[in-house]
Amino acid sequence: MTKIPESSEIYLDTSFLAPYLLAPHQKYQEAQKLMARLLIGSNRLVLSALVLDETMNVIKEVMQSQEDAANLKKGKNHKDYISDIRKAVDTVIQNSNFRITQFNDEISGCSKAVDNIDNFTLRPRDAFHLSYMQDQSIDYIVAGDKKFDKIHACKNIEF
């Protein structure tokens, strides 16, 4: 397991950000504790719009799972959870510890994502997360699974 760095940029994967933002999530307490440690270390937390997209989907899934199955309407959409989604996004965009990033070089970033699929057998979304890190020269990621452990240039702070 990678030690938590100090004064570094750390890319946040959805597997960490969603539990941090969503109290009903089973890993909420664990995420809160790790976030405190990241901030105590004066780290800058980086994410992409892709992470926010994935987080919105997790919010819908978790909130939907909290409902009584008898009251569950078929076809519920993201709008039914808009207050939870808005609260999560506002938490990120209003906090100066977070930085939402895009590619510095979009063409190179997209090409690198394809290379990451080929080189590391990643799913496209994970390949893009790694590509954002490469584009921004970010060495650390907080991810809830071990897929990033196999990547030599990426230091996974396990969650």
Predicted features along the sequence, with ranges:
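Conserved beta-strand segments of alpha/beta enzyme cores
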Residues: 44, 97-99, 155
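Active-site-proximal, substrate-binding regions of enzyme catalytic domains
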Residues: 18, 32, 50-52, 56-115
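Secondary-structure boundary motif
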Residues: 37-40, 61, 94, 119, ...
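Short, well-structured N-terminal submotif of metal-dependent ribonuclease cores
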Residues: 1-51, 58-74, 136
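Active-site neighborhoods of divalent-metal-dependent phosphate/nucleic-acid chemistry enzymes
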Residues: 5, 94-140
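Acidic, PIN/NYN-like endoribonuclease modules and their adjacent C-terminal/linker elements
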Residues: 1-5, 9, 130-159
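Histidine- and aromatic-rich ligand-binding microenvironments
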Residues: 12-13, 47, 122-124, 145-146, ...
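Short, surface-exposed, polar/charged, turn-prone segments marking secondary-structure boundaries
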Residues: 38-40, 73-75, 128-131, 151
